[in-house]
Amino acid sequence: DRFSSSENGYTHTLTTIPRQANITDSPTAFKDTDNPWFKYSNPGNFNMECWLEPNPNGEHYAKRTLSGTSGTFTWELTNDERKQLREACKGKTCTIRIGLYSNNCSWASYHDRTYQMTNAEPTINSVVTSIINPFGSLCLQNRSNIKFTISATAKYGATITNYAVSGNNFSYAGSKNTCQTSNIRDSGSLKYTVTVTDSRGFTASTIKTINVTGYSYPTISMEAFRSNSSGTKDVSSGT
């Protein structure tokens, strides 16, 4: 402390008291495969604890302790911690808080950043097709229908929310993993696009080819006419 005096009184100047630790820099965005970092200033040399918080005001993950009056801290995230962060992120991206406590969690400093999911597309395990009204093992034009049964798996805690099949004047989209066409009107190698969408909005697609044999139902052609006694057509004098 310093004192000074004059005829008008005296001045008392207090020394600067170090306060909380602060985050001074951090990446504006990072991927789920990255190790995030931040720079900090800790003029009071307090004890510190940092954390990652998807969806701010939620649970704290990847807690670490650190020390020093300034520096850069980088997480070395474990596979379990990455799994926790991914499952907490409900979209293709989400807000994640980089937080820093100091002085036994008395003060907090934080930056809210963008967390980006990568390689999170669902997997189509199989697309099974069944021929309804076949001829033997053949899928026949104008006779047979095709039933699609789709098996797919979402990643990192997401769920499959939509199944879709389209092609050759057929279209289906819905929450059920099965659908069926009406009678197939075309023949040849018909291609159908199968798409699944998960709860984060990620999609995966595949092409399914169905071989359809050309077929038309038989027709009967009839003609009526006059004939003579020998059965020969005679439109003028036949009976």
Which residue ranges define each predicted feature?
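Surface-exposed, short loops/turns at beta-strand junctions within beta-sandwich domains
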Residues: 77-95, 180-189
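Edge beta-strands of extracellular beta-sandwich domains
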Residues: 3-15, 105-118, 202-212
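Short beta-strand segments within Ig-like beta-sandwich modules, predominantly Fibronectin type-III
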Residues: 63-69, 168-177
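Extracellular interdomain linker/stem segments of modular secreted and single-pass surface proteins
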Residues: 15-23, 116-128, 211-220
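Acidic, Ser/Thr
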Residues: 38-45, 144-157, 239
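Conserved structural position at the C-terminal beta-strand
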Residues: 2, 98-102, 196-198
